[in-house]
């Protein structure tokens, strides 16, 4: 809908002789008394035009030319905002389009022909998924859904960290528990994984092999079994939340030599060395980030010979370019904030265009139960497990609570609130709006034979002119722009806020506008408006990955 205004305003600027390099920004006022749409272009352009913003706004209005029956009123407000009020006819004609488009309403083609890769979760297979990892998983899944709505060919990838020191520690942890099961006395290291699941994996190995592995010093046997069992558990947990991946990239491939005998990690070192950004000192290999203005260089290969996280991350991103992805999206936890800029700098040095890399950092999660905050530590074995949360509140509440706050904000997951069957629970509130409409339509079919698929009757919508009807209709028109905003910001929370506002509009409409008791044509028109609302709720729920119950 915002694209409806931009060319008209641009033409008005041109015909009025107003030259500006400022972008035409169209906003949707939260309070509809300030219009259905608004622009601050007069405020932005006033300084370079050396004119009073309100006077400039009035000049722009005088040169606006909209199609007939679309704009009811245009006014200058405040310091120089231009507010636009849509006609009831235009609003309801647009609602007709919602019904005609159905599941396709809100989708676009801005990404048509483009390949996008969204990487998310990518948890080390060292233990069951924690609640913190779950937030990133839901965020990534929703972001991938948003890209898909705009025509991108989306690949959902899990970076499978099956190499590195943590996996070695995992194997050692299982081996120690296995030796204990064999009857040996072991001083279990405090630095290793303590959870009960380690003992359960060791028990499986003992059941399969007895004491035959007791003399083996090959940690890989234990690591491999642990990796298989834990990753199967991770995938099962993700499936419970409706989180899927199309591709699993194994980190060990970056350590595997190609036909020429060179690993992906080594190619990065060689390429950076050629650019004179590599040095060896203190027994380690360093990325010379001091040449980029940073205070310290960053280690790529430790003195132990083990790569730091930065090196395989750089090599991994190069594979994304090599696979032809024009849009690269990474969903990370807050623990990646310090590391990731170095990865981008390395890619720039090596000649890769990083403008098409988007990063979504999600902050930490704490879980509150009866006012008590739970602690999380996979290593110590007292992790706050994602499976337990799903068992407690369900998949829908888990997903929606993870994204109902900005990804940039710390999230306090209130378990008791998530289980409430009242309007205080945002999940219940949204789903109840959908269920309420479904119940209404069942009654309408029984009492007046209403057919929600009857396209020839859609013109009846144009008879709706009350404030509650127009507010709901106008809210439905905001949906396509809200998808684009959520995608641009990589912020599904915006979609949650929009759907909550839409549900509020519907509940107000339901209270103020009698439906089945209205005169026949008005009743059918209001029912069509309800069907359109149900459609937009469903479309939004599909992006967020939550169910749309027909009864509650």
Swiss-Prot record:
GO molecular function list: arginine-tRNA ligase activity; ATP binding
Chain location of the short sequence motif 'HIGH' region per the record: 123-133
Class of the enzyme per the UniProt entry, highest EC level: ligase
InterPro entries from the UniProt entry: Arg-tRNA-ligase, Arg-tRNA-synth_N, Arg-tRNA-synth_N_sf, ArgRS_core, DALR_anticod-bd, Rossmann-like_a/b/a_fold, tRNAsynth_Ia_anticodon-bd
Gene3D superfamilies in alphabetical order: Arginyl tRNA synthetase N-terminal domain (3.30.1360.70), HUPs (3.40.50.620), Isoleucyl-tRNA Synthetase, Domain 1 (1.10.730.10)
Reactions catalysed: tRNA(Arg) + L-arginine + ATP = L-arginyl-tRNA(Arg) + AMP + diphosphate
Subcellular location: Cytoplasm
Biological processes per GO annotation: arginyl-tRNA aminoacylation
EC number from the UniProt entry: 6.1.1.19
Subunit and partners: Monomer.
Family the UniProt entry places it in: Belongs to the class-I aminoacyl-tRNA synthetase family.
PANTHER family hit by this protein: ARGININE--TRNA LIGASE, CYTOPLASMIC (PTHR11956:SF5), ARGINYL-TRNA SYNTHETASE (PTHR11956)
Record's protein name: Arginine--tRNA ligase
Organism encoding this protein: Pelodictyon phaeoclathratiforme (strain DSM 5477 / BU-1)
């Amino acid at each position: 809908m915002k694209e409806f205004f931009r060319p008209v305003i641009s033409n008005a600027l041109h015909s009025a002789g107003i030259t500006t390099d400022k972008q035409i920004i169209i906003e949707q006022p939260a309070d509809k008394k300030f219009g259905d749409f608004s622009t601050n272009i007069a405020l932005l352009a006033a300084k370079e035009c050396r004119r009073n913003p309100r006077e400039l706004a009035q000049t722009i209005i005088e040169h606006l030319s909209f199609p007939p029956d679309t704009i009811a009123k245009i006014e200058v407000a405040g310091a120089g905002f231009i507010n636009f009020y849509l006609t009831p006819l235009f609003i309801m004609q647009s609602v007709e389009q919602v019904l005609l488009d159905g599941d396709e309403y809100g989708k676009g083609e801005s990404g048509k022909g483009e390949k996008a890769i969204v990487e998310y979760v990518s948890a080390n297979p060292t233990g069951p998924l924690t609640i913190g990892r779950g937030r990133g998983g839901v965020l990534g899944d929703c972001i991938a859904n948003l890209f898909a709505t705009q025509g991108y060919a989306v690949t959902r990838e899990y970076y499978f960290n099956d190499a590195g020191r943590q996996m070695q520690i995992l194997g050692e942890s299982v081996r120690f528990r296995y030796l204990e099961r064999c009857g040996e006395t072991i001083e279990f290291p405090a630095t290793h994984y303590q959870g009960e699941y380690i003992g359960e994996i060791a028990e499986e190995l003992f059941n399969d092999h007895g004491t035959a592995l007791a003399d083996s010093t090959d940690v890989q046997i234990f690591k491999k079994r642990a990796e298989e069992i834990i990753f199967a558990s991770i995938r099962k947990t993700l499936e419970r939340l409706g989180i899927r991946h199309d591709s699993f990239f194994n980190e060990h491939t970056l350590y595997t030599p190609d036909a020429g005998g060179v690993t992906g990690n080594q190619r990065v070192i060689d390429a950076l060395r050629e650019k004179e950004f590599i040095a060896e000192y203190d027994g380690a290999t360093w990325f010379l980030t001091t040449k980029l203005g940073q205070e310290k260089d960053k280690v790529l290969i430790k003195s132990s010979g083990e790569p730091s996280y930065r090196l395989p991350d750089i090599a991994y991103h190069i594979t994304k370019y090599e696979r032809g992805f024009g849009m690269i999206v990474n969903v990370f936890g807050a623990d990646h904030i310090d590391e990731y800029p170095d990865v981008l700098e390395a890619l720039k040095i090596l000649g890769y265009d990083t403008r098409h890399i988007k990063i979504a950092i999600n902050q930490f999660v704490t879980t509150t139960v009866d006012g008590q905050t739970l602690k999380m530590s996979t290593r110590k074995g007292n992790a706050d497990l994602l499976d337990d949360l799903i068992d407690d509140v369900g998949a829908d509440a888990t997903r929606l609570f993870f994204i109902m706050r900005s990804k940039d904000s710390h999230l306090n997951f209130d378990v008791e609130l998530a289980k409430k069957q009242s309007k205080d629970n945002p999940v219940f509130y949204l789903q109840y709006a959908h269920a309420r409409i479904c119940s209404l339509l069942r009654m309408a079919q029984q009492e007046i034979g209403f057919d929600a698929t009857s396209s020839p009757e859609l013109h009846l919508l144009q008879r709706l002119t009350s404030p509650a009807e127009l507010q709901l209709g106008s809210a439905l028109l905001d949906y396509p722009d809200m998808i684009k905003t959520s995608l641009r910001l990589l912020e599904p929370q915006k979609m949650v806020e929009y759907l909550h506002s839409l549900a509020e509009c519907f509940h107000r409409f339901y209270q103020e506008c009698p439906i089945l008791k209205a005169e026949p044509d008005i009743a059918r028109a209001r029912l069509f408006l309800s069907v359109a609302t149900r459609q937009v709720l469903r479309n939004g729920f599909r992006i967020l990955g939550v169910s749309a119950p027909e009864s509650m």
